[in-house]
Amino acid sequence: MAAIAPAWPLDSLVASSPYWGLREQSFSQAADTLRLVADSPLHLPRGEYLAAWRRGEISAAALETALSETGWTGGAQAWLDAEPRDVDPVPPPRLLAACHREAAGPLSAQSWTDVVIQQISQYCAAWFDRDQANWHLDHERGFYAAWLEQMRHPYGLSALPERREQLRLRAERLPGDAEAMLAAGLAQLQAEPEWLKPWLQALLMRNNGWAAWCAYLGWQAGLKGETDGHLRQLLAIQMAWECLLDDGARGPDSAWAAWHRDWGLRLHGRADPRTLIWQRAHELSLHAPLAQALCRESAAEDGTRPAMQAVFCIDVRSEPLRRALEQTVPASRTYGFAGFFGLPLAYRVPGSDVAQPRLPVLLAPGWEASAAPASKPSAARRGWRAFQRSPLSGFALVESAGLAKLAALAGRSKARGRQAALPQLDPWLTPDSAKPVPRDGLGLERRAEIVSGLLPAMGLAGALAPWVLLVGHASHVSNNPQAAALQCGACGGHGGHQHVRLLAGWLNDPALRERLAALGRAIPADTVFLPALHLTHSDEILLLDADTLSADARARLPGLQAQLRAASALARRRRAPLVGLAPEADDAILLNKMRQKGDDWAETRPEWGLAGNALFIAAPRAKTRKLDLGGRAFLHEYDWRADPDGKGLQAILAAPMVVAHWINMQYFASTADPRRFGSGNKLLHNVVGGRIGVFEGNSGDLRIGLAWQSVHDGQRLRHAPLRLAACIDAPPDRLAEALAAQPVPRQLAENGWLHLYCVHGDTPLRWHADGGWRHD
């Protein structure tokens, strides 16, 4: 069960690696495992690589290197000449349900596999729903026991009239306890020890979406030091279905015998090794030249005081805007840091009883912050919301209130033809709203301790500019249940505005500055920290809390705003072709159209999110400032000379790099296997349980991952599934020490889930599976 990775709910939908539970295996071993248990590829179809080769996207040098890593010595041309014309791979073994030739009934087009997936999925949707319907299943008996009770009633199999009574009688004989069911199922079905573990994993992968949701519940429980049994009970339900379909026949022509033969004969099938070589060559074609270019660049900064400094999130969408800002304002410097700005907070929305974690999902909140409370909804409004959630509201709501919504619908539709307004990211995000304030007694000393560590970690240890912008990011989209996937992942799938408001408020506090000066981190009197928000759908920079500035700072503000507008215009012009707009158009037109994309109900691609991500670079900005990284790189500020004990490097490897790896693998999986790890067609999404996830249509498994429109433009892929290249500027021995202290990052590097490069010397070094550095 540890192989099942969690998937987060819609209101905190962060990118996560669906392969996280397989990280103890090498990448190639995991490819074999996924093929065995789910018929899931860890690569694109081979034809995609051949097309990339013909287009020149895969270089001959990269293919030679990829072949040499496998021990091939015959040269690339001989390998290409041996390319088989027709590939007919042996299919993976089936589950028992798939071995029944009989469909669900003589008049049904469904297979038994479809029936099992549908029944379990609909039951899970009803069981886990807390926010959508007013009627809920009785939870007193437990997840498995309630499912079994449903199966023992005639209505539990209403979609299977031809088999209902037979299955109901078999359900009567199943154990009422999940653990007893698992034991009884193993005894009845007699799975061989050799393939028991992958078979159990295959059972869970049959409803992979709901298994991932159960794994999420277990993850959340683990953060609290607790346990959750839903995933194990889901396994019991899956095994119970296998037992329900087992007719007891054990002859050579029985379904049971076919199932046993399948697993015995196909257990050791492998993923296509040639395609994995193409996959590696595709990665090397980007990674190797970039690593070499980084080694050529100097990390030295001049010592002059910059006119402006701006700290952005490491999100790949920040890189083009940072480059535009530096080109527009040459005396500026930009930095990259995790978008929660080192503040591990949970944020309580006004009027809510729940504090939302707004930090990387790898971490637990350290404290809570909130803004001024909003007025509570009236009784009438609460009653109206309850009516909207009632089982019959889907019909009655349209009949009784449809016309009342007509004017609003017409207004929204008409507004798409005019200049769209800035997104209202939070109802309380207004100049006169209260700042988020720590509620757990976080005093001056604790704030000073936090800030004194954050400033050098962000690269702000030297001379501070008159303006220091702390730039979070957010996106604005309409009619998209997966909108949180476009927000800041480091903020738990929310905008980063509250973090930068909080931190800027601290850094502008005279009392805190006085304490920092005593600690040896004096801030110049004319330095102003200004919170800002990068709107990724339109590449605008929205300044926050400018009304609180001093008169002197407000007098300087128009000049800053003009510089930011110019940088945004340059970034928009460069991004325009990617979203189907003409780069030569007037900036006012581009801005309006990009805003409209975010406000358009029918727009399936308001922005490309993190599509294209392939690089993580931890180095001084001087190392990358001259490079056009094409919006594909997570850029984290790091200067090894300011990190004598290596703790900063360890923290980068353990958190930001792992988060970047998760994002990279989310996009990888949704592209390489959209059937299993993507959420399908965005136009067909229906929300499940208010916040749990989506169905594609109204049937099938819970869909996880990204919609197809997030990685494909209708003509071609917009994301190439390449494993992350993590490029670190630090001496190789220092980097090796940090890896030794962080087992998870080392595991990812040695098992090939990411490629770790040291770009400190004249030529790059890559960390290999044997635990050492080598030249590629």
Swiss-Prot record:
Zn(2+) binds at C313, D315, H473, C488. Disulfide bonds: none annotated. Belongs to the inorganic carbon transporter (TC 9.A.2) DabA family. The keyword Cell inner membrane applies. The gene is dabA. It is a peripheral membrane protein. Its cofactor is Zn(2+). One of its GO terms (cellular component) is plasma membrane. InterPro entries: DabA. GO terms for molecular function: zinc ion binding. Keywords: Cell inner membrane, Cell membrane, Membrane, Metal-binding, Transport, Zinc. Part of an energy-coupled inorganic carbon pump. The keyword Magnesium does not apply. It is found in: Cell inner membrane. Forms a complex with DabB. Pfam families: DabA. This is Probable inorganic carbon transporter subunit DabA.
